[in-house]
Amino acid sequence: MPTAAVFNIEGQQVGEIELSEAVFGQPVNDAVLHEVVVMQLANRRQGTHDTKTRSEVRGGGRKPWRQKGTGRARHGTIRSPIWRGGGIVFGPHPRDYSYRVPKKVKRLALKSALATKVDAGRILVLDALELPGPKTKEMARILANLKAGEGALVVTAERNVNVEKSARNLPGVKSLEARQLNVYDLLNHPHLIITRDAVARVEEVLA
């Protein structure tokens, strides 16, 4: 059964916690991780890109010169795709890129992402994380104490506004509540800092 050290906000180890084998001890499945990350990034796309075809570009209603007798190539409009300023052929138009993968695949990917942090020794469990107010300096100090200053995903059991506001101005740091935990953010941050309560919440949902 995998284990993780438990720290206080001063960076001192105060114990050890046993992690669920069914959640944190699964083999890493790279193919599933890739599938879910691609889906998440696709779902973030706005899809508002647009180009104009020859029928949408302004102008070009008049034939530029007569069909025969000039010695020049025949043209019917200055908005043809082969003209500068003409329409675009097969260009992008607004579309919805979002799609879904099966729920079981998402759960498996989340377990794999958690396993990568356990295998790399990059999971730090906090006994508690309470801040008196939104203080970026205090959050930076806590991360420095935990030797996670280069970037971390901070996960709490419930939404913690003080933690959220304290973390959002720090580069490479993001705060989530347990129910928002996702594959992309886990893989995109070097460290996972998670409270003991959040571990229980994640295990309850994924076990």
Curated annotation (Swiss-Prot):
One of its GO terms (biological process) is translation. Keywords: Ribonucleoprotein, Ribosomal protein, RNA-binding, rRNA-binding. Residues 47-59 have a biased composition (Basic and acidic residues). InterPro entries: Ribosomal_uL4 (IPR002136), Ribosomal_uL4-like (IPR013005), Ribosomal_uL4_dom_sf (IPR023574). GO terms for molecular function: rRNA binding; structural constituent of ribosome. One of its GO terms (cellular component) is ribonucleoprotein complex. PANTHER family: 50S RIBOSOMAL PROTEIN L4, LARGE RIBOSOMAL SUBUNIT PROTEIN UL4M. NCBIfam families: rplD_bact (TIGR03953). This is Large ribosomal subunit protein uL4. It comes from Desulforudis audaxviator (strain MP104C). The lineage of its organism: Bacteria, Bacillati, Bacillota, Clostridia, Thermoanaerobacterales.
